[in-house]
Regions:
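Periplasmic/extracellular loop-to-transmembrane helix junction in inner-membrane transport proteins
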Residues: 71-82, 119-121, 125, 149-198
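C-terminal transmembrane helix and the adjacent membrane-cytosol boundary/short C-terminal tail
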Residues: 96-108, 272, 307, 349-383
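Short cytoplasmic-facing helical segments at TM-TM junctions of multi-pass membrane proteins
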Residues: 220, 262-309, 332, 336
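Transmembrane alpha-helices
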Residues: 1, 36-122, 130, 253, 257, 290-323, 350, ...
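Transmembrane-helix boundary motif in ABC transporter permease subunits
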Residues: 195-225
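Generic hydrophobic transmembrane alpha-helix motif, especially the helices
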Residues: 225-260, 269-270
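Glycine-rich helix-loop "coupling/hinge" segments at transmembrane-helix boundaries
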Residues: 242, 270-271, 318-358, 374-383
C-alpha cells in the first residue's frame, strides 16, 4: 500500500519592515508602541476659536451707560454714582475676559496650582455666560428707562436701579434710626432658616422612615399627615404665638412645620418603594432589622429624600419671610415690612435683591450636596 505524503504548510510570508510590533534597529524606542495604539493622538496645538459673543456684556454695559448718562430723566431724584460705576466695571471686565478668552484653553491647572485653576474657571465661566450676563445688563437698562427716563411707573413705588444700588451700599451695615442693616438681617435670617430647616428635615426623615417601614406606624401616621400636612404653615401663626411666647421660637416652629410635610411624604414614598430584591438579598445574607433600615432602605430612598429636601427648602423660604414679620426684630422679612411702613421702597427692592442672591446660594449648596451624595445617579436636574 503506497504511503500517503502529508503536504507541508507553506511558510509565512516575510514581514515587511516596520509592519510588525517589534521595533527595527532604525526605529526609535516607543515608535512601535505608538503605531500599535493609534488611539493615542498627540496634543493639538490648534488655537481655540475666538468668540465674538464674549463682547456682549461690554456692549450691553456701554449701551446702558449711554442711556443713563444722555437720556434726560423725567423724575427728580438725587443723582448717584454707584450705578454708573457698576456699568463701567462690567464693561471693563467684559473686555478683559473677551480679549483673554483663549488663555483658559491653554492653561493646564493642577490641584496644587490654585491661581491657575481659578483663573481658568473664571475665564471659562465669563465666556460661556456672556449672553446671559448681557441679558441681565439689558434688563437693568430697561428698568432705568421705565422708572427714571420715561416715568412709565410711579417713582415712590418703583425706584430706579441707581437708588436701589445706593441703598445696598448705605444700608449694608446699618439701616438708620437705630435699626439693623442688611448684613445683620441676613445673618439673623440665616440662623432662623437653618434652625427650622434642620429640625423639620430631621423630623421629616425620621417620620418618613417610621411610617414607611412599620405598618403600625403607617396606620396611625397617615391620617395625621392627611389632616395636618395640607394646612399652610403660615395659617398657623396665631396658634404658634400662643404656644411659644418667644417670637423666634414661634418662627422656628413654623419653618420646621413647613419643611416636615414634604420631607415626610417623599421619604415615606422612597422607603415603601425599595426593591424587594434588595431586601431579599440582604435577608439571605443574614441582615437584621436595623441593617435593612439603615443600610438598605434609607440609601435606596435617598433620591426621594433629596426631592423632599428641595421642596421643603422652597417652603421654608416663604414661611421665613412671613414669620419674620410677626414679632421678630431682625431678618430680611422684618426689614421689608419695616421699610414698607416708612414708604422707603428703595430699601424694599434692595432687600429683594439680597433675597434673590441669598436663597439662590443656599439652593445651590444643597444641589452640590446632592451631587456629592448621589454621585451614581444619572440624568438629574443640574442647578
Amino acid at each position: 500500500m503506497p504511503a500517503i505524503e502529508m503536504p507541508t504548510p507553506p511558510a509565512p510570508p516575510a514581514a515587511k519592515a516596520g509592519a510588525s510590533g517589534a521595533a527595527s534597529p532604525a526605529t526609535p524606542p516607543g515608535a512601535a508602541d505608538a503605531r500599535a495604539h493609534p488611539a493615542v493622538a498627540p496634543l493639538s496645538t490648534k488655537a481655540a476659536p475666538f468668540r465674538l459673543s464674549a463682547f456682549a456684556p461690554s456692549v450691553a454695559a456701554a449701551a446702558a451707560l449711554a442711556v443713563h448718562q444722555w437720556v434726560p430723566s423725567q423724575q427728580t431724584t438725587a443723582p448717584t454714582r454707584i450705578y454708573p460705576r457698576i456699568l463701567l466695571t462690567v464693561l471693563a471686565a467684559g473686555v478683559v475676559i473677551a480679549l483673554t478668552q483663549r488663555l483658559w484653553r491653554r492653561m493646564k491647572p493642577t490641584p496644587r496650582n490654585f491661581p491657575a485653576a481659578f483663573a481658568s474657571n473664571a475665564l471659562h465661566w465669563g465666556v460661556s455666560s456672556a449672553p446671559v450676563l448681557a441679558a441681565g445688563v439689558m434688563l437693568l437698562c430697561a428698568w432705568d428707562l421705565v422708572t427714571l427716563k420715561l416715568a412709565l411707573v410711579p417713582l415712590p413705588y418703583f425706584p430706579g436701579p441707581d437708588t436701589v444700588f445706593q441703598t445696598l451700599i448705605n444700608d449694608w451695615a446699618s439701616a438708620g434710626l437705630g435699626q439693623p442693616g442688611l448684613f445683620e438681617c441676613m445673618i439673623s435670617s440665616l440662623i432662623l432658616l437653618l434652625s427650622g430647616y434642620f429640625v423639620g428635615s430631621l423630623l421629616g426623615i425620621a417620620c418618613g422612615v417610621l411610617i414607611g417601614w412599620f405598618p403600625a406606624a403607617r396606620y396611625w401616621g397617615v391620617p395625621v399627615m392627611k389632616l395636618v400636612g395640607p394646612v399652610p404653615a403660615t395659617a398657623l401663626i396665631p396658634m404658634s404665638l400662643m404656644l411659644f411666647r418667644n417670637p423666634t421660637l414661634s418662627a422656628v416652629w413654623l419653618i420646621a412645620l413647613a419643611v416636615w410635610f414634604p420631607v415626610t411624604m417623599l421619604t415615606l414614598s422612597g422607603v415603601m418603594n425599595v426593591r424587594a430584591s434588595y431586601l431579599d438579598v440582604a435577608r439571605t445574607l443574614g441582615a437584621g432589622q436595623a441593617y435593612l433600615v439603615f443600610r438598605v432602605a434609607i440609601p435606596a430612598a435617598l433620591p426621594n429624600i433629596f426631592v423632599g429636601l428641595f421642596m421643603g427648602l422652597g417652603a421654608s423660604f416663604l414661611t421665613m419671610v412671613v414669620a419674620e414679620g410677626v414679632g421678630v426684630q431682625a431678618g430680611l422679612g422684618w426689614y421689608i415690612d419695616w421699610a414698607r411702613a416708612y414708604s422707603d421702597y428703595g430699601k424694599v427692592f434692595a432687600a429683594l435683591f439680597v433675597m434673590v442672591a441669598y436663597f439662590s446660594t443656599i439652593m445651590t449648596l444643597l444641589f452640590r450636596v446632592r451631587d456629592h451624595v448621589l454621585v451614581w445617579q444619572k440624568g438629574v436636574i443640574k442647578w
